[in-house]
Design a protein with these regions (language model features):
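Active-site neighborhoods and metal-handling regions in enzymes and metal-associated proteins
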Residues: 1-393
């Protein structure tokens, strides 16, 4: 039984921080923020306006506004369309004017992402706001919202568990059916069918849904993205199986590996180092450790084994509600909106532990899994082993 999400409590967390920052209203444009507050799947450009007190208002395409309203916890949903009086920003400005906020302090979501368009406020939208309200003060709310989102509540953690369980199930079905001669897209379809049957709402990633890479496509240098193709899987290939599920808008991300037939000595050596590195990474994700410390420990291990050049220099990323919450990446660097090496792991954070170890001409292996940070260590939400499966079919 899933824990019931407390959307009132979520709203109050945001409004409390708005009060501390002196923000009168927050314009939330990120898909993840809209989902966190309203609880509905909003595939379109949706913008929520959150007042410092009272319920939020969501503006979304009119062709989907009734469905979104039905699925949302808060029912204040307004349909928009490119028609006089119905345009999104025309209606948002009207909402703010009615509340006397022409000279107010307005929060917006500014920033960028290294991996995808995170639906931050667009430059053109920012210009509309500044031109309409030249005396208003606009504050970037992205940082304090990220601080709220990074600590998960009970309902979020339960949804992560369900998404992880669905990914584990999908992997199990794939490993039972995987055989030489299948195409990568066929394998992706097997995974997708199994996970949809188990309740997954979306193969959420923009990297090809269920990522399947085989042979040379599994071992691109630093290659961490394998959208499936019509390539046929051959004997001797290693195969990356990177599966994605969604449950109550919360995401599952599981990557494991298979080898078609008896591994070569070089494949076995890489596999042994890969498995040892996976275990070290999992052991390193514990409260009190910084992202930079975890990355340094992994880099040192890769140096000792002589495989540093083949390891993607990032050992995990955030995960959350639809929109991904990818920030921050587990690296010992600090680039605004991308990485934060001094960030400390805390209980109730959920991190994707990730390892990409690719040696072109030999094999490439990938591990991803959701990990809950606990007060004493961590809990892997995916339960499947790190060792590559040997497939003799």
């Amino acid at each position: 039984v899933s824990a019931q999400a407390d959307y009132d409590a979520r709203l109050k967390k945001i409004q409390a921080r708005m009060g501390e920052q002196g923000i009168d209203a927050l314009i939330a444009s990120r898909l993840s923020t809209v989902g966190y507050v309203f609880g509905a799947f909003v595939p379109w450009r949706g913008v929520a306006v959150i007042p410092r007190e009272g319920e939020p208002q969501l503006f979304v395409l009119g062709l989907d506004s009734e469905r979104v309203k039905d699925d949302s916890f808060f029912k204040n949903v307004t349909g928009v369309a490119p028609l006089p009086g119905m345009a999104m920003w025309e209606q948002i400005l009207s909402y703010l004017r009615v509340r006397g906020l022409e000279k107010g302090r307005i929060g917006v979501e500014l920033g960028h992402s290294p991996i995808r368009i995170e639906t931050f406020l667009l430059a053109s939208e920012y210009e509309i706001l500044k031109d309409a309200f030249p005396q208003a003060k606009f504050e970037n709310a992205t940082h304090f919202l990220n601080e709220i989102f990074i600590i998960k509540d009970e309902a979020e953690i339960e949804s992560f568990r369900q998404a992880a369980e669905i990914c584990d199930l999908g992997l199990g079905v794939v490993l039972k059916e995987l055989r030489v001669g299948m195409t990568e897209t066929e394998v992706a379809g097997i995974a997708e069918h199994a996970m949809r049957k188990a309740g997954s709402e979306l193969n959420w990633t923009f990297t090809g849904g269920q990522e399947i890479g085989s042979g040379h496509r599994a071992s691109y240098y630093w290659g961490g993205c394998t959208p499936p193709t019509r390539k046929r899987i051959e004997r001797g290939d290693n195969v990356i199986l990177d599966l994605h599920a969604m449950y109550n808008l919360y995401l599952g991300d599981l990557a494991r590996n298979a080898i078609m037939g008896e591994p070569t000595p070089a494949q076995r050596e890489l596999s042994d180092i890969f498995v040892a590195a996976c275990n070290l990474l999992l052991e390193s994700l514990k409260p009190g450790a910084t992202y930079g410390e975890v990355a340094d420990k992994m880099d040192a291990f890769m140096d000792r084994t002589g495989y540093r050049q083949y390891a993607l220099p990032g050992y995990g990323h955030g995960i959350g509600i639809l929109g991904n919450e990818y920030y921050p990446v587990v690296m010992n660097s600090s680039v605004p909106y991308e990485s934060k090496g001094d960030l400390v792991l805390q209980p109730n954070m959920v991190e994707v532990a990730a390892l990409v170890l690719n040696k072109p001409g030999v094999a490439g292996m990938r591990m991803e899994m959701t990990v809950l940070i606990t007060k004493d260590g961590n809990e892997p939400l995916n339960k499947v082993p790190f060792e590559p499966a040997i497939i003799e079919r």
